Every structure is written in C-alpha cells, then in structure tokens.
C-alpha cells in the first residue's frame, strides 16, 4: 500500500488541467467517494497493525496534498476568468474619474426635500411651451417686454416664419398654469426645471438657468401662511440663525408681490462686500396669486386664494457655496465639480 500511496503522491504533484471540465475530472478521479484515495482508505482496515501508524500518516498526507492541489488549480482558473472578464480593450489609457452629483442637483434636491416635508408635491411640464401658459394665463399684458424677442426665445416654424405663440419657457410658472388648468384646489405643488432667457452670457447671467417655483391654493390662504413657509425655508436652507425681510415688488401674476432677502450668510448681517454693506441678500420673489390668474385658469377667486414663490437654483447655490460665476455651472470643468464631492 505504501508503494501505491507514493505513486499517487507523485501523480498529484504533477496534476495539470486545461479547463474546468478537466479539473472536475481530476477531482472525481482522486477525491470522490469512488476515487483512488477513498479506495485506499477502504483498504486501510486490512493493513497489519504494526504498519497502521505509518500508512495512516501517509494516507492523510496524500489526501491533504490532493485537496490542496485541486484547490490551487481551481483558484488559478477563477483568477484567470476574472481577469479576462474585467479586461476592456476599448478602455482609455487615462484613469477613469468617478462622477458626482452636480452642485445644482444637490441644491435642487435640498429645496425639494424641504418643500416635500411641508406637503408639496412635484409638478412638471414641457420646456417648449405656448404663449397661453407662459404669458396669458399668468396675467402678462400683451405689450409686456417679456413677450418681445429681445427677452424670449421663439421657436421657428420654418425659414420664413416664426411662430409667435411657441417659445422656450421663460419661467416654470407655466407648470403652475397647467396644474391649475387640470386640477381643482387644494393645490400644493413645486415646479423645478430649466428655463430660458435671451440674455448675453456673463458671470451673472446666462441664456438658460434653473428655477423652483411653489404654488399653494386653497380656501383662506393668507400672506401670513406665505411668510411662515418662507421663514422655515430660509432657516432650513441657510441655517437656524437666518433672518428674512420682505420688500414690496411687482410681478404680473401676484398681488401683493414681494421680494425676499435673507441676512447675509457670509458676514452674518453685519455688512460685507458680498452683500454690498447692507447685511441682506435677495434670494426669491413671492406674493399672493393675482385673482386674474385664478380666474384665467378656471378657479373661482371669490372662494379660493393662494400664494406663489419662485427662486433661481443658481442663485441659491451661489449663496450656499459662494460661487461667483454662473458660467461655471455649465462648463463641465471637473476641477470645479470635484469641489462638491463632500456634499454628495
């Protein structure tokens, strides 16, 4: 038996397999219940007593070496398979950098989360809109400057004609108009999205940017309700110590209208170059929905009232992360975008 064991030891040391099928055949040959090693184990009971210790040690050595060799070959195959699967011959020779969320997406999601906790749902609408939903339904006069081609992008029907009633939306208020058109109060929505203006691109203006507008319509909605929402939003977005102030303003779709400032988050309201020494920074416009807007969209203004507010996401991002050039948000400069990895 010792001679047979030595023969198997030599065989096992030289085991090779070209593929997984050959490896499985070797395992069956040596380690299965009917394999060569188990046959020797069965014959062990016939070994003379004086040889049992020596033969037993050799049998254990044989079994251990067979298991180790089979395991080694299996590991080599798995490593080889993984290497082949991971190899991508089209991959660039330069390191691949993992992407992160864009700073505008980070801030947009923060805004959505705040209003979601206040019971607002998200509404969406087309970026290519008609005059009705962008201007008429929002109480813009026929001669309002926003209707002029110097301020708005109009869609060309063909080379000879420009369709005056189809535009790239200038604000997400068009989503509010569609919501009022197809829903009955109570309405409580926010409208995040991209908008377009015919502007010269500079550090403080761009031809496209992003807005979030909010609309709440129900019975007995008051300006006090609006103010409470604004204060909560400011504290959630910029910190618990943030103060707000409201200044009278004008918007075609709200009456009364106001612009909201927050205490400067850089100097704490003490005055600095960023806030031009005033201690305050403007962040959004708001007001009570004009009765004409309600009526134009099929809502009885004698029964229902509401408030609306709108802010530029770029503006909020500028204030939150102190970015002073709007163009950075659309240039895809990875050096700039990587600065926001911690916020992801």
UniProtKB/Swiss-Prot annotation:
Gene3D superfamilies: Bira Bifunctional Protein, Domain 2. Its cofactor is Mg(2+). It is an enzyme of class 6 (ligase). Its main location: cytoplasm. GO terms for cellular component: cytoplasm. It comes from the Bacteria. Mg(2+) binds at residue 255. Keywords: Aminoacyl-tRNA synthetase, ATP-binding, Cytoplasm, Ligase, Magnesium, Metal-binding, Nucleotide-binding, Protein biosynthesis. It is found in: Cytoplasm. InterPro entries: aa-tRNA-synth_II, aa-tRNA-synth_II/BPL/LPL, Phe-tRNA-synth_IIc_asu, Phe-tRNA_ligase_II_N, Phe_tRNA_ligase_alpha1_bac, Phenylalanyl-tRNA_Synthase, tRNA-bd_arm. It holds the Pfam family Phe_tRNA-synt_N. GO terms for biological process: phenylalanyl-tRNA aminoacylation. Binds 2 magnesium ions per tetramer. It catalyses: tRNA(Phe) + L-phenylalanine + ATP = L-phenylalanyl-tRNA(Phe) + AMP + diphosphate + H(+). Tetramer of two alpha and two beta subunits. NCBIfam families: pheS. This is Phenylalanine--tRNA ligase alpha subunit. The lineage of its organism: Bacteria, Pseudomonadati, Bacteroidota, Bacteroidia, Bacteroidales.
